[in-house]
């Protein structure tokens, strides 16, 4: 998948806060990510690369082993990333028995958009101001080598593109030819447009507003 240079640069982050929990088993120190995991929530908040893919796959497999019949929720706010890392997570999502809810906060771009669409039908969501970006995959770096090597790389790019199109087609209901045309260039969708496109099923209401209407 294509990424802007600014998206590839390491970003500074604040120190993740920890907190103390008291239970019948004693006292333990925890942090937001551990707490989310206990609630069967996985948070993809970085670019999709080998490291983040391994983390996500490990969490999916552990949560399935703990209870294969309970839903897993994946929150997504990611600029996208590598195609092979994307497909590794995608295959694992389809492999585990548990239903997977996908929720976009902020953005699901490139590879992350495919993961958003790959959630269990009826359980794919986004917040109102989230955005989704889809485009054709690409190989990272400058392609160099003999002509025969360039042919191999070109064939691999075409294979990746076809696989991405058929994958999105499977989960959105759009014809693969339509997806090919739409992803010739960056296609940016609002949450409502992503719903119309078939990438998500529901645009979530704010909980405060929902509570006020009850």
Curated annotation (Swiss-Prot):
Family membership: Belongs to the peptidase S14 family.
Swiss-Prot/TrEMBL keywords: Cytoplasm, Hydrolase, Protease, Serine protease
Functional note: Cleaves peptides in various proteins in a process that requires ATP hydrolysis. Has a chymotrypsin-like activity. Plays a major role in the degradation of misfolded proteins.
GO MF entry, a single one: serine-type endopeptidase activity
Catalyzed reactions: Hydrolysis of proteins to small peptides in the presence of ATP and magnesium. alpha-casein is the usual test substrate. In the absence of ATP, only oligopeptides shorter than five residues are hydrolyzed (such as succinyl-Leu-Tyr-|-NHMec, and Leu-Tyr-Leu-|-Tyr-Trp, in which cleavage of the -Tyr-|-Leu- and -Tyr-|-Trp bonds also occurs)
A Pfam family recorded for this sequence: CLP_protease
Active site: 110 (nucleophile), 135
Listed GO CC annotations: cytoplasm; endopeptidase Clp complex
UniProt lineage: Bacteria, Bacillati, Actinomycetota, Actinomycetes, Mycobacteriales
Localisation: Cytoplasm
GO biological process terms held by the UniProt record: protein quality control for misfolded or incompletely synthesized proteins
Protein name: ATP-dependent Clp protease proteolytic subunit 2
Species: Mycobacterium leprae (strain TN)
Cross-referenced Gene3D superfamilies: 2-enoyl-CoA Hydratase, Chain A, domain 1
Entry annotated with the keyword Hydrolase: yes
Subunit structure: Fourteen ClpP subunits assemble into 2 heptameric rings which stack back to back to give a disk-like structure with a central cavity, resembling the structure of eukaryotic proteasomes.
Coiled-coil ranges per UniProt: none
InterPro entries: ClpP, ClpP/crotonase-like_dom_sf, ClpP/TepA, ClpP_His_AS, ClpP_Ser_AS
EC number: 3.4.21.92
